[in-house]
Swiss-Prot record:
Glycosylation: residue positions: N33, N73, N97
GO BP term, example: cell-matrix adhesion
Localization in the cell: Secreted
Primary role: May play a role in neural plasticity. May be involved during axon regeneration.
Keyword match NADP: no
GO cellular component: extracellular region; lysosome
Identification of the protein by name: Ependymin-1
Domain of life: Eukaryota
Length: 221
């Protein structure tokens, strides 16, 4: 874990964190409702795994992610996920063919909310702290996802606790989740409504030894 934190922090510094602010050990924070664009990059090979719009209900712990039609360098259908963390399930939705899969979510951790066990590492300025409106103050957090043996490195804004980016790593993958065009509201609450063709779909069991979580879903696309 310590080696991972040091390596991840080094990457962050290279991305433009120019001024180190004194850390005061902030309390764990909670993200607001959000609508925005999420881009997922595989750091090995530099492949964009997915990019699309999302809505996040931070109260009821729901995410709807719909992959952008501009991401067309793939042969399969565009990804459309409805993740219900309180229920511990997600739906893989195919609007074109009106089909749906329902599977278990084995972890509540994801890139749009600071996980409960996250440990604060440092507070940083992105940009310049001496030029007005040319800096963003962020908190850096690290932690692990025991269910998938993954480790993460997550940055949130100081104040509203908006997640900016998340590095997620296991023995086999390293992904970067970038959050942009964020609006602190759910613009269309109906996106959390289950399509009629998904109602009554039976839960599919994951293959033995496979653990499904937010991060692994994007590694499979």
């Amino acid at each position: 874990m310590q080696a991972f934190a040091v390596a991840a922090l080094s990457i962050w510094l290279c991305l433009g964190a120019t001024t180190l602010a004194e850390s005061h050990g902030p309390q764990h924070c909670t993200s607001p409702n959000m609508t925005g664009v999420l881009t997922v990059l595989a750091l090995t090979g530099g492949e964009i795994k997915a990019t699309g719009h999302y809505s996040y209900d931070s109260t009821d712990k729901k995410i709807r992610f719909t992959e952008s039609e501009m991401h067309l360098n793939k042969t399969e259908h565009l990804e459309d996920y409805l993740m219900l963390f309180e229920e511990g399930v997600f739906y893989d939705i195919d609007m074109k063919n009106q089909s749906c899969k329902k599977m278990s979510l084995h972890s509540h951790a994801h890139a749009l909310e600071l996980p409960a066990g996250a440990a604060h590492q440092v507070e940083l300025f992105l940009g310049s702290d001496t030029v007005q409106e040319e800096d963003i103050k962020v908190n850096i957090w690290t932690g692990s996802v025991p269910e998938t043996k993954g480790q993460y490195f997550l940055s949130t804004t100081v104040g509203e606790c908006l997640p900016l980016s998340t590095f997620y790593s296991t023995d086999s993958i390293t992904l970067l989740f970038s959050n942009s065009e964020v609006v602190t509201e759910v613009k269309a609450p109906e996106v959390f409504n289950l399509p009629s063709f998904c109602e009554g779909v039976e839960l599919e069991e994951a293959p033995e030894g496979q653990k499904n979580d937010f991060f692994s879903l994007f590694n499979s696309v």
